[in-house]
Regions:
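Conserved active-site tyrosine of GNAT-family acetyltransferases
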Residues: 115
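Glycine-rich, flexible loop segments associated with nucleotide phosphate handling
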Residues: 105-111
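Conserved acetyl-CoA pyrophosphate-binding loop and the N-cap/start of the following alpha-helix
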Residues: 65, 69-78
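GNAT-family acyltransferases
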Residues: 1-56, 60-64, 81, 85-89, ...
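Amphipathic alpha-helical recognition patches that constitute DNA-binding helices
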Residues: 56, 73, 110
Length: 155
């Protein structure tokens, strides 16, 4: 079955349990549900406010919504939010190392593909986290004319 083309992503601020917030927070450094075609397709957000000129993003796509461009659009929307708040930020992300036993970690590969397509890289090994060894990806600030368009935020 061919992958469907993703439509525009709308971000909806939410709390840690994915409950939509009644009002948008005063800063963008929060979590979001990603909506497309009238349904939740995934989500993402920031691990906290910027520190030392860097901010970290994380994102995901729900099963059944993968391979439709939602992950890339969500990550791109997070970049736009970060740079709209502070155009000098370097944005970082982490992905898992793929296992060496020949079994491919498809989530890590998909995420690496998204990050590469957005200009991140090259990845560097980072300290092991609670999920095991990870790669650290970085994207320095880009020229304003090359920054992604700001997403729609449901308020």
């Amino acid at each position: 079955m061919p992958a469907r083309r993703a439509t525009a992503i709308t971000l909806w601020p939410c709390d840690a349990q994915a409950r939509p917030l009644a009002a948008a927070p005063p800063t963008p450094w929060t979590r979001y549900l990603a909506w497309a075609d009238g349904q939740v397709v995934g989500g993402g957000g920031f691990t906290g406010p910027p520190r030392q000129g860097r901010v970290e993003i994380g994102y995901f796509t729900l099963p059944g919504q993968q391979r439709q461009g939602h992950g890339r659009r969500t990550a791109s929307a997070l970049l736009a939010l970060a740079w709209a708040a502070d155009a000098s930020l370097t944005v970082i992300a982490h992905t898992r190392h793929a296992p060496r036993q020949g079994r491919h970690n498809t989530d890590a590969a998909a995420s690496a593909h998204i990050l590469l397509s957005l200009g991140f890289g090259p990845p560097r090994p980072a300290r092991a986290s609670r999920v095991g060894p990870v790669w650290r990806w970085a994207l320095p600030p880009t020229r304003p004319d090359r920054q992604p368009q700001a997403p729609t935020i449901n308020r």
